[in-house]
A protein has these predicted regions:
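A transmembrane-helix-recognition feature enriched in membrane-embedded lipid enzymes
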Residues: 2-36, 54, 61, 73-84
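Helix-adjacent hinge/juxtasegments
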Residues: 87-114
Length: 220
């Protein structure tokens, strides 16, 4: 990654933060848990199609998102996803070897010292609740021993970009300046908790961080 591209991504992060503050009553907590330099993996619950922008604006460092290949290939948005360094992932059923290619891309990003962001649920929540994390985190961490920073996002369920009240993006926007809360938690390493327990532990941490955001919004 060239120095100018890094500068562009840092500038975009600041612009996105301002836009998120305009669109939402946006609060961010625990930014200091992300390392100031070096690689890290951020995991968060997946509520809406705005999640990536909210997380990107709330993070103190640019994030490289792992996202579905069909969305990445959107004719009007592909240039943007490439600019911010998004990492596409395709179904093994449609493209044998796709998972390995994505793991290679994630590993390359981490070894460049980037922060990679994944949504372990693998899809938008259909009901506002956090669903079981899918496999994949272990494969990433088996290749690269980086700190994992859990994050919990609250307030976007109910937006037109979520599945609340019907399919996401198939409804008219009905909320403006809604309260949105993002909480980052202390980082952990794969060595602390191994195997399936790692996923369960991270899921529990993300649930707790989302609950903190829900409580904050309820008391505003």
């Amino acid at each position: 990654v060239t120095w100018w591209l890094k500068m562009v991504r840092c500038l975009l992060r600041r612009v996105i933060y301002v836009v998120m503050r305009v669109c939402y009553r946006f609060s961010v907590h625990g930014q200091g848990y992300l390392p100031k330099r070096g690689a890290a993996l951020v995991v968060c619950n997946h509520v809406s199609f705005m999640d990536a922008l909210v997380l990107g604006g709330g993070s103190p460092r640019p994030l490289r998102f792992v996202m579905d290949q069909p969305i990445f290939e959107s004719p009007w948005l592909k240039w943007w996803f490439q600019l911010v360094g998004a990492i596409p992932i395709e179904s093994e059923r449609h493209s044998p070897g796709a998972l390995r290619r994505t793991l290679d891309d994630i590993s390359d990003a981490l070894r460049q010292g980037d922060v990679v962001m994944v949504f372990p649920e693998g899809r938008l929540t259909p009901d506002g609740e956090i669903h079981a994390f899918r496999r994949g985190l272990e494969s990433i961490l088996a290749r690269d021993n980086v700190p994992v920073v859990p994050a919990g996002l609250a307030g976007l369920w109910g937006s037109w970009t979520s599945h609340y009240g019907g399919k996401a993006l198939k409804k008219w926007p009905s909320r403006f300046r809604a309260p949105v809360s993002l909480h980052f938690g202390p980082p952990i390493t794969a060595q602390e908790i191994e195997g399936v327990a790692l996923r369960r532990y991270l899921e529990a941490r993300v649930r707790a961080l989302k609950a903190a955001g829900d409580s904050e919004i309820a008391h505003r």
